[in-house]
Regions:
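Basic, amphipathic "hinge/linker" alpha-helix immediately C-terminal to the N-terminal HTH DNA-binding motif
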Residues: 74-96
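Intrinsically disordered, low-complexity serine/threonine- and proline-rich regulatory segments
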Residues: 1-17, 95-97, 105
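Glycine-centered, phosphate/nucleic-acid-interacting loop/turn motifs that mediate DNA/RNA or nucleotide
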Residues: 64
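N-terminal helix-turn-helix DNA-binding core of bacterial DNA-binding proteins
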Residues: 10-52
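Short, solvent-exposed loop/turn elements at beta->coil junctions and helix N-caps
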Residues: 9, 71-72
Length: 111
């Protein structure tokens, strides 16, 4: 087995699906950055760094897929919460359709 090839392939798949994963996590609940990282890890076992998440969230904001707001905490340290927009929900539906079609196609050829 070519472990190096598989490792690189897994990395590419993770990078290519991270926006899809983040939008799915935000579908029914708003989260601040650290919570979002933890939710992604909990549901996918993918560990991402803050240095990966925040540029992604900025791109999603520029595309009007998510919004953010600062919320003051009792500790005095504000947290930036991310929420899916209506455009984000529509986009996520399109992405899910593509993903499920792709998944079904892969299952067919993998038998």
């Amino acid at each position: 087995m070519n472990e190096n090839f598989v490792h690189k392939w897994k990395s590419q798949v993770k990078k290519g699906t991270l926006a899809f994963i983040a939008l799915n996590v935000l579908k029914d609940h708003e989260f601040y950055g650290y919570e979002l990282i933890e939710q992604i890890k909990k549901h996918t076992q993918i560990e991402i760094a803050e240095g990966t998440l925040y540029p992604l969230m900025n791109r999603l904001k520029k595309e009007n897929l998510v919004t953010s707001k600062w919320v003051e905490q009792d500790s005095g340290i504000p947290r930036k919460y991310y929420t899916l927009t209506a455009t984000g929900e529509e986009t996520l539906l399109q992405m899910r359709t593509f993903w499920f079609d792709l998944e079904n196609s892969i299952k067919k050829i993998s038998k």
